[in-house]
């Protein structure tokens, strides 16, 4: 299995996703957007990962690589490749598919409950049954958040998840393109790096937890790792179906 990653931050270790890739000994290639905007042809990889970032999707003037990255992601989706977008990555998928990305009413930072949208699942049985997303994602789980923007659910996609602070937490498109507002990659070291680099965001807020609250949740780190491994196994199956 060949995995290509769009990385926006120098210190992004890929967290639990990186651990899963290492354990599987799969080939991993990267486009480091902060250094260059070289993109491979879609046929050169099986799965695309679009990671998070401190920038916003609509800051094309500040980040010259954003427009070509969006064009690349659109090309990959059109080619039918499986795609996983985390936080900023999910927002990118939404915009590429015609959705809008705007400021969320609240900043959401820390561990928060994510709930599945049962009525959407009931109304779209073929889309979701065929996709067979990990059962640990239903009916709810605890996800790690660090965001101030939010995405629309794009046309043709099915809304999957919501949280108290953010109505749109996840969607699936074409059965193999998954956009998640939370960070499935969040393990302890990944979170420590984020706090070190962006700790200034940890101000008083209704949905903003303190460093102590975030790092003191050992069970959440464990359950997040299990969810991420199940999710990556799901993508592994999807890639096998494509090949």
Task: Say what each PLM segment does.
Residues 1-81, 203-243:
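N-terminal beta1-alpha1 cap of cysteine-dependent amidohydrolase-like domains
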Residues 6, 31-33, 104, 146, ...:
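Conserved beta-strand termini and adjacent loop/short-helix elements that scaffold enzyme active sites
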Residues 14-16, 59-61, 94-96, 155, ...:
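Short glycine-/acidic-enriched loop or helix-start segments at secondary-structure transitions
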Residues 20-23, 64-68, 101-102, 161-162, ...:
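Glycine-rich, phosphate-binding/catalytic loops in enzymes
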Residues 27-29, 100, 142, 158:
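Conserved beta-strand segments of alpha/beta enzyme cores
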Residues 35-39, 109-111, 151-152, 167-168:
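A short acidic, often aromatic-flanked loop/helix-cap motif at beta-alpha or helix-coil junctions
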Residues 50-121, 142:
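Cysteine-nucleophile active-site neighborhood
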Residues 117-243:
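Amide-donor transfer/coupling interface in amidating biosynthetic enzymes
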């Amino acid at each position: 299995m060949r995995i290509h990653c769009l990385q926006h931050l120098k210190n992004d270790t890929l967290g639990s996703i990186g651990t899963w890739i290492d354990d599987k000994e799969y080939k991993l290639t990267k486009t480091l957007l902060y250094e260059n905007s070289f993109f491979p042809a879609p046929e050169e990889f099986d799965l695309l990962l679009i990671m998070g970032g401190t920038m916003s999707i609509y800051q094309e003037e500040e980040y010259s690589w954003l427009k070509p990255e969006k064009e690349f992601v659109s090309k990959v989706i059109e080619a039918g490749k499986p795609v996983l977008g985390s936080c900023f990555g999910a927002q990118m998928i939404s915009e590429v598919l015609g959705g809008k990305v705007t400021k969320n009413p609240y900043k959401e930072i820390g561990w928060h409950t994510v709930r599945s949208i049962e009525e959407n699942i009931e109304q779209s049985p073929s889309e979701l049954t065929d996709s067979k997303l990990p059962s640990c994602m239903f009916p709810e789980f605890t996800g790690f958040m660090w965001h101030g923007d939010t995405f629309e659910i794009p046309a043709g996609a099915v809304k999957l998840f919501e949280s108290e602070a953010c109505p749109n937490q996840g969607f699936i498109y074409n059965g193999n393109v998954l956009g998640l507002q939370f960070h499935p990659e969040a393990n302890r070291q990944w979170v420590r790096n984020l706090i070190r680099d962006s700790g200034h965001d940890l101000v008083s807020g209704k949905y903003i937890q303190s460093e102590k609250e975030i790092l003191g949740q050992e069970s959440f780190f464990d359950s997040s790792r299990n969810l991420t491994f199940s999710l990556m196994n799901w993508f592994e199956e999807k890639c096998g179906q494509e090949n």
